[in-house]
Amino acid sequence: MRFATQKCTLKRFLTAAAVVAVLTACGCSRPVNNPRPLADYAENTLFSSFSGRSPKTLDPQVSYSSDETIYTYTIYEPPYGYHYLKRPYEVIPKTAERVVTPVYLDKNGRELAPGADVSASAFSRYVIPIKKGIRYAPHPAFAKDAAGNYRYHRLTDAVAEKLTNPLDLPEKGTRELTADDYVYGIKRIGDVRTVSPVLGILSSHIVGLKAFSETFAQALKEAEAAGRPAPDIRDFPVEGVKARDSHTLEITVYGRYPQFANWLTMAFFAPVPWEATAFYGANPLLKKNNVTLEAWPVGTGPYRLAS
């Protein structure tokens, strides 16, 4: 009786499987919801979904979409990158001279001896040497006149209204990458006007970033209420972020956070020259023509955006 029951069950299974196979075969020949003709799939073509306008933003402290990384990671250069041919991926220097080992500090800021108790580490300090001789792609933001004044940090309405591509301006300049550019980029994460998606998590790791963000936001409100120009983020320090000299970047984070080396490979930590934000803020009419950092990045990478 037990064998007969198993046999009957097997028959039902085979019958059901045959029905499914027939239906599947029919479905493969004529898909119900196929968005493209079958002939399109005969070629070696990659199809991908596309939603909205892409790229939406190329601001390195804001961009967080995979559709934008092909631009941001070839135009901008964080301190570190990855060796993608190694398994597992290895963090390697990009604009940094080397991948550094952090110095661990106690709650009083004193350096701990090697092999000290992990629980005694209140802070980790990364002192990153930046390579010399790296320069920004030519851009009108850096252009100066014979007297050394920036040519395009003040634009008339007549010029700004007609400008749709900043590279159409006749004069361009460049300068060397410095550690201050990385400090400026990190401060932009804390600037509420930037609306960086990583401010929340990084403010809990980078010493002083939360306090900077709150202090600067208050300064913006006070300036607006008094009818004064917006303050400059360069005038507001972040306790744990500083340039020791022109080519040495120092970042201090809370506790031991080895994943911070991976953060330093991301475009959020790309350098931004203050001249770029000064240029794009030279006249409000530029934003109407989409002449902004979101659309026209200024970086040190091997590529630049052109039209």
PLM region spans:
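Bacterial N-terminal signal peptides that target proteins for export
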Residues: 3-15
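Bacterial N-terminal signal peptides
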Residues: 16-25
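Bacterial signal peptide processing site
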Residues: 27-32
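Short, well-ordered beta-strand elements
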Residues: 42-52, 124-129, 182, 249-250, ...
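Extracytoplasmic
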Residues: 42-44, 74-76, 94-96, 121-125, ...
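N-terminal lobe/hinge region of extracytoplasmic solute-binding protein
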Residues: 48-118, 298-300, 306
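Gly/Pro-rich hinge or "lid" segments in bacterial periplasmic/extracellular proteins
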Residues: 83-86, 207-248, 252-307
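Aromatic- and charge-enriched surface segment that lines or borders ligand/interaction sites
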Residues: 98-205, 250
